[in-house]
Amino acid sequence: MAKSRVSVRTTHDSVASPIISPDSSSICVRARRAAICTALLLACLFAPAVADAEQQTFTMRYGPVSLGGYETAYPEPLVKTPKRSGYITKMSARIVDRHGRRMPLGDVMLHHVVFINSGHRGGVRKMSSCPGRPGEPFYGTGEETQTLLLPPGYGYRVDRRDRWRMIAMLMSHKLEQTKAWIEYRITIETSRKLTPVRPLWLRANGCDPTSSYTVPGGGAPGSDDVRSSDWAMPISGRIVAAGAHMHGSAKRLTITQPRCGGRTLIDHRPRWGASNDAVYKVRPLLHEPGPIAAGYFLSRKGIPVRRGEPLNVTGVYDAQLAHPAVMSITHIYVARDDKASMACDPLPADRRIDWSRKLGRNSVAPMQLPLTGLDDRGRPRQIASAQGPSVVAGASVTVDLERSLFSPPNLSIALGGVVTWRSLDQERHVVILANGPRAVDSPLMRQGATHAQRFDVAGTYNLFCYLHPVTMHQTLTVRPE
């Protein structure tokens, strides 16, 4: 059973304090004399209250998450909280090993993680930005490795009785079974009142059942797939921070204000790794490499918004190639202010964009994935098509997903034909496009589930299950009329 581990660090705005944790004895090792060591510990334990702001930093871990060779895991557990009342001013997450050391992308990738506050009994009910969905997402990141940052004087209010859950996606790039831990670090202001912020998760695809959507492909070179959704603001206030999550082939993610002529309030631009970045070297490629950073908006003054007014969230992706399961999500933090201006004043002069990675490229060529199999020594290798017998079918056919294999692995159907994939395994599967003329993207399929799709564009579709990416392939040929 996965467990959590906690360490705590306390600091004041005026002076730095030593770490108060099970290894506080390291202070003694560095002290030259026992008397100095004793004085330091007594000062930490019995120091009088101070007027300066006090912050505590908690380092917590969830795990282990066990991953088989090249597998993808989707943990959705309840997780430990700091059990402190106060205001979160900073939070980050990463993948570490059992010793707390960062794991390289070549071993395990944190594709995304979201922390959701379910509140506590008798407290204010926490809800998402979509009606009927319990819990308040308050921090998330993906390959962008974004940190929750807020301007000075602001914080996300938490109660020591709150319950948190986590939704994460981890991808293994190792043949051997491995274990990983999700480490999350939280800084909480505990001694003074800050201006509270409300987190809002806004998506370009609105309140669809899933947070991802599909770019079908087939557009002209350089063309854009544009998805847009309006979100009514639940409170009046000021946007003081905003992060973003996008996938491979994203071009931008914007928030615009229709009542002020559709002006752009926030423009989240993706930043891509250099051609030799580790994100492009991992094998097998389980998904199209995403941006290594996205522009993170900050402003102490904030952008005024009024309750009920719509803000438009627009995600733009390459439309030439098919891109299944993309995301366009912005996380905005709004400080309540019932007197927020209705005027379309200039945007705050103190606004700035923070980058988790300073260096990178502003754009990359869109791409699709190769199929990846294993050689005789268990090493990943690129393959041109699925291995195994072929079946020629007519207008409709059912493909079984059984023993973590497609049956049949090679299939030919007539133009306009319908393929129905049927999962017979207890393990979950997904059918997704690696490369081909149009997108294929099934939901996660449990035993007995089916997914059907009609094919109106001729060509070769290489498909795989990214939960079992090196063993579970299908090559589908759609014959022209």
Predicted region positions:
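N-terminal Sec-pathway targeting helices
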Residues: R30-R33
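Bacterial N-terminal signal peptides
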Residues: A35-F46
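Low-acidity, Ser/Thr- and Arg-rich intrinsically disordered low-complexity segments
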Residues: M1-C28
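Beta-strand-centric surfaces of beta-sandwich/beta-rich domains
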Residues: E54-R238, G243-G378
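Sec/Tat signal peptide C-region and signal peptidase I cleavage site
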Residues: P48-A53
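Compositionally biased, intrinsically disordered low-complexity segments enriched
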Residues: S7, S14, S24, C44, ...
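Extracytoplasmic copper-binding redox domains, predominantly the cupredoxin/blue-copper superfamily
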Residues: G378-E481
